[in-house]
Amino acid sequence: MARLKGQKVKECSFCGLSVAELGGNVVISNGVAICPECSKICHNLFKEKLSNPLDSKSNGLPTPKQLKDHLDMHVVGQEDAKKVLSVAVYNHYKRILKNNKYDNGIEIEKSNILLVGPTGSGKTLLAKTLAAEMNVPFAIADATTLTEAGYVGEDVENILLKLIHAAHGDVSLAEKGIIYIDEIDKIAKKNENVSITRDVSGEGVQQALLKIIEGTIANVPPRGGRKHPYEDTIEINTQNILFICGGAFVGLENIVKNRINKSSIGFSAIEKKNIREDTSLKYLEMEDLIKFGLIPEFVGRLPVHSYLEKLNKEDLMRILVDPQNSIIKQYYHMFKMDNVELVFEKDALESIVDEAILKNTGARGLRSILEGLLKDVMFEVPSISKTKKVIVTKESVLNTDINPLILVGNAIKKPWAKELYEINLKYDKK
């Protein structure tokens, strides 16, 4: 029964105990009261639901096709990587639901994933989007900050602490999560030959990562940093944590192409001639990764691998406007909160993409370009009461001294009025 406005709360809205019986120990908000015991019960119910994220979906485990369809809504292109990831994630969580064993007692091993592709091609976004769809904790780690135990830097166990934090301290939930380790190519050995000097940020880190990636009971310092002999630690089993490693692997395409050219089996002379450096990663083999500097044991822990192609101009244009959470849509709704319409000329969008290509920053650079472009306008607009529209022109993209046009009422609040060409981006498309 709804409580009338102004009616005094006299009991817990859940268990019915009076405020007097509870000694006044209740929390009241918007006419609803809850006592400590009911609050505790609600907390435990939520915790139980979160600790079984895979069971919380009404339709059970999403199929690989459903996972790819979800990725298509958020990530442009990269069809091969989407399929590989969708199948790998589906198999991983199917394995967990079966308690790692099949009917005849066969134990199914974990298959971690390696993504190879240039900066800004979507590696992190793919992993993050899948984790969100699977409703599991997700953490990102940077391999360049890791060093071998005993040296200045970050212990590999600290990446597990990030996952525990993402699970709000629930270790059992974290044990079903996903960790994305970026810049994994930066911990490659300096050369193929074993060195007599210590490579504390290369081979040493690979060795340290081996156990937690394949599955072990790890002890994590609760405050991060180095482990101390007398400090309490958090125990976490990594057997069911999915590790996705990614990196640009600059120069790997040459290693693949050289191997193919030297091979006398499997490729005709015409096929070899048609294999370009930018497409050679399609033929990536484990031996190429070892040649690059990853140790064989580490490569063996990443049996599933896929490559991401460098994004072209058409891809970047689509990334700006097509995905459900595209950058342009985000800025459009940001301005809409101030009752201002944000409009881009078509050639302005093309100029933004051209700048990202020139800087070689991929999709990641689009946001920083837009942020710099709209910075002054976002500062001015909230103070102008009659602002109706902001128009981003090609000139404002190419010339940092020119700001986008601001329409106040029906007049342009800038001296460089010109004919406008609006592009229909279907901002409100759901």
Swiss-Prot record:
Which CDD domains does this UniProt record tie to the protein?
RecA-like_ClpX
Binding residues annotated for ATP, in chain numbering? P118, T119, G120, S121, G122, K123, T124, L125
**Entry annotated with the keyword rRNA-binding:** no
Q: Where does Zn(2+) bind?
A: C12, C15, C35, C38
Q: Name one GO molecular function term.
A: zinc ion binding
- What are the alphabetically sorted keywords of the record? ATP-binding, Chaperone, Metal-binding, Nucleotide-binding, Zinc
Domain annotation ClpX-type ZB: ranges: 1-54
> SUPFAM superfamilies, per this entry?
P-loop containing nucleoside triphosphate hydrolases (SSF52540)
Keyword field contains Metal-binding: yes
Q: Which GO biological process categories is it annotated with?
A: cell division; proteolysis involved in protein catabolic process
Q: Name one GO cellular component term.
A: HslUV protease complex
* Disulfide cross-links: none
Among SMART domains, the record links this protein to: AAA, ClpB_D2-small, zf-C4_ClpX
Q: Which NCBIfam families is this protein grouped with?
A: clpX, PRK05342.1
Similarity-based family: Belongs to the ClpX chaperone family.
Q: How does it assemble?
A: Component of the ClpX-ClpP complex. Forms a hexameric ring that, in the presence of ATP, binds to fourteen ClpP subunits assembled into a disk-like structure with a central cavity, resembling the structure of eukaryotic proteasomes.
HAMAP family cross-referenced by the UniProt entry: ClpX
The UniProt function text for this chain reads: ATP-dependent specificity component of the Clp protease. It directs the protease to specific substrates. Can perform chaperone functions in the absence of ClpP.
Q: What is this protein called?
A: ATP-dependent Clp protease ATP-binding subunit ClpX
Task: Say which species the protein is native to.
Answer: Borrelia garinii subsp. bavariensis (strain ATCC BAA-2496 / DSM 23469 / PBi) (Borreliella bavariensis)
